[in-house]
UniProtKB/Swiss-Prot annotation:
<keyword id="KW-0934">Plastid</keyword>
<dbReference type="InterPro" id="IPR024942">
    <property type="entry name" value="Maturase_MatK_N"/>
</dbReference>
<dbReference type="Pfam" id="PF01824">
    <property type="entry name" value="MatK_N"/>
</dbReference>
<dbReference type="GO" id="GO:0003723">
    <property type="term" value="F:RNA binding"/>
</dbReference>
<dbReference type="InterPro" id="IPR002866">
    <property type="entry name" value="Maturase_MatK"/>
</dbReference>
<dbReference type="InterPro" id="IPR024937">
    <property type="entry name" value="Domain_X"/>
</dbReference>
<dbReference type="GO" id="GO:0006397">
    <property type="term" value="P:mRNA processing"/>
</dbReference>
<dbReference type="GO" id="GO:0008380">
    <property type="term" value="P:RNA splicing"/>
</dbReference>
<keyword id="KW-0819">tRNA processing</keyword>
<keyword id="KW-0694">RNA-binding</keyword>
<dbReference type="GO" id="GO:0009507">
    <property type="term" value="C:chloroplast"/>
</dbReference>
<comment type="function">
    <text>Usually encoded in the trnK tRNA gene intron. Probably assists in splicing its own and other chloroplast group II introns.</text>
</comment>
<dbReference type="Pfam" id="PF01348">
    <property type="entry name" value="Intron_maturas2"/>
</dbReference>
<dbReference type="GO" id="GO:0008033">
    <property type="term" value="P:tRNA processing"/>
</dbReference>
<keyword id="KW-0150">Chloroplast</keyword>
<comment type="similarity">
    <text>Belongs to the intron maturase 2 family. MatK subfamily.</text>
</comment>
<protein>
    <recommendedName>
        <fullName>Maturase K</fullName>
    </recommendedName>
</protein>
Length: 503
């Protein structure tokens, strides 16, 4: 952050906070290169740090200085030779550098806000891992929930327009449009498996997508938090965010009543809960389904009117948690009543009291998992184990390691299940499939193979979790048993689920 501030001091007095000149500075690409070397282990390095050099960057900047190369005809865009034969490499370098430039206003705003307040507000900096306490503590007290897939803008111009509230430099925005127009099909629908999460330009597109989500949530959460004060509102106030923030400086009700005669009553729901994770959002409420339907249609109209994103209301399902399961990160979550009987005695009279409490159930999806195992030939569609014929040519240790690794990964991911019986059934299928694969390799029967090698061969399938908990609780066997049977969330399952969804 100090590097950004030092570099920007030279331009602030002359360029009026314009970011466009930074695209021609070599140190910007050096910063992008250094960040590429320090990126997370979960993000694959696509070779940008190996191919980049100072000579390539100088050549790229000299080409950008030649303004004739920036002129692109809409009807003849394929004939533009701005990058020549190094189109992919140059586009990757520019996207990395431009991502660093666009991040500067956001970083400076964060630093200035921290200096002014001198305290960090926890509710603005919540980790993605706070979703687990939300499910454990708040979810059992709610009645209805909707799992909403946040729609992607159908046009890249919408992503560019969301930056205009923070990036006040029109030249930078025009350059971004030029870049996207040159390298990507402008009218292509953006999907997570295509251009927006492309490995070569992941940083830039994640920045654009996050700015889009921030724009959407800033208005949604403001209305959600201020629902007790907003008695009258209109969708017209949401069409332009700049005008929206100018008007909230004045009394809200007076502005809405004077400027927007055609109004509608805003629904008040103090129990509404909003959670976002991995491109999805969860909207849950303790109130009636009528208010959930109002939120549902509000979101649909909000996306259509403000972001021009077509979204069908039928894709948002409102689930009653006491009757239907809720899909979350591959778990089937539901709320069931847990009734306990308490005997009370008052003087000579005694009576029984039913104490009903709601309990969160996170179930292992046994039927979809059996279908997945059947697809990769570990069992048939009925769940009967079969041999993995394609692995029969491997060594015994390699076969066992593969099966043990699959079983360990499933145990790790679904350790948050409240009932482990279905998980044990899947591990049983994997164990017998492993035995049948080894027996097929050695041209023997399963019974004969087990008698020859003994039961210790497959102990690894069931000892991994016990070894972990024995290290955590070496002396208290009762605590070990209680925790082993209970629900435990591993925080890395969010990253695992994210990688599975985008492969």
């Amino acid at each position: 952050m100090e590097e950004f501030q030092g570099y920007l001091e030279l331009y602030r007095s002359q360029q009026h906070d314009f970011l466009y000149p930074l695209i021609f500075r070599e140190y910007i690409y050096a910063l992008a290169h250094d960040r590429g070397l320090n990126r997370s282990v979960l993000l694959d390095n696509v070779g940008y740090d190996k191919k980049s050099s100072l000579l390539i960057i100088k050549r790229l900047i000299s080409r950008m200085y030649q303004q004739n190369h920036f002129l692109i005809s809409v009807n003849d865009s394929n004939q533009n030779k701005f990058f020549g034969y190094n189109k992919n490499l140059y586009s990757q370098i520019i996207s990395e550098g431009f991502a660093v430039i666009v991040e500067i206003p956001f970083s400076l705003r964060l630093v200035s806000s921290l200096k002014e307040t001198e305290t960090v507000k926890s509710y603005n900096l919540r980790s993605i891992h706070s979703i687990f306490p939300f499910f454990e503590d708040k979810f059992p007290h709610l009645n209805y929930a909707s799992d909403v897939l946040i729609p992607y803008p159908i046009h890249l111009e919408i992503l560019v327009q969301t930056l205009r509230y923070c990036v006040k430099d029109p030249s930078s925005l025009h350059l971004l449009r030029l870049f996207l127009h040159e390298y990507y099909n402008w009218n292509t629908l953006i999907t997570p498996k295509k251009s927006i999460f492309a490995k070569s330009n992941q940083r830039l597109f994640l920045l654009l997508y996050n700015s889009y989500v921030c724009e959407y949530e800033s208005i949604l959460l403001f209305l959600r938090n201020q629902s007790n004060h907003l008695r009258l509102t209109s969708f017209g106030i949401l069409f332009e965010r700049i005008r929206f923030y100018e008007k909230i400086k004045y009394p809200v009700e007076e502005v809405f009543a004077n400027d927007f005669p055609a109004t509608l009553w805003f629904f008040k729901d103090p129990f509404i809960q909003y959670v976002r994770y991995q491109g999805k959002s969860i909207l849950a409420s303790k109130d009636t389904p009528l208010l959930m339907n109002k939120w549902k249609y509000y979101l649909v109209h909000f996306w259509q009117c403000h972001f021009y994103v077509w979204f069908q209301p039928g894709r948002i399902h409102i689930n009653q948690l006491s009757k239907h399961s809720f899909d979350f990160l591959g778990y089937l979550s539901s709320i069931r009543p847990n009734i306990s009987v308490v005997r009370s005695q008052l003087l000579e009279n005694s009576f029984l009291m039913d104490n009903a409490m709601k309990k969160l159930d996170t179930l292992f999806p046994i039927i979809p998992m059996i279908g997945s195992l059947a697809k990769v030939k570990f069992c048939n569609t009925s769940g009967h184990p079969i041999s993995k014929s394609s692995w029969a040519d491997s060594s015994d240790s390699d076969i066992i390691d593969r099966f043990v690794r699959i079983g360990g990964n499933l145990s790790h991911y679904y350790s948050g299940s409240s009932k482990k019986k279905s998980l044990y059934r899947i591990k049983y299928i994997l164990r017998l499939s492993c035995v049948k694969t080894l027996a097929r390799k050695h041209k023997s029967t399963v019974r004969t193979f087990l008698k020859r090698l003994g039961p210790k061969l497959l102990d690894e399938f069931f000892t991994e979790e016990e070894q972990i908990f024995s290290l955590l609780f070496p002396r208290t066997s009762s605590t070990l048993k209680r925790f082993y049977r209970g629900r435990i969330w591993y925080l890395d399952i969010l990253c695992i689920n994210d990688l599975v969804n985008h492969e």
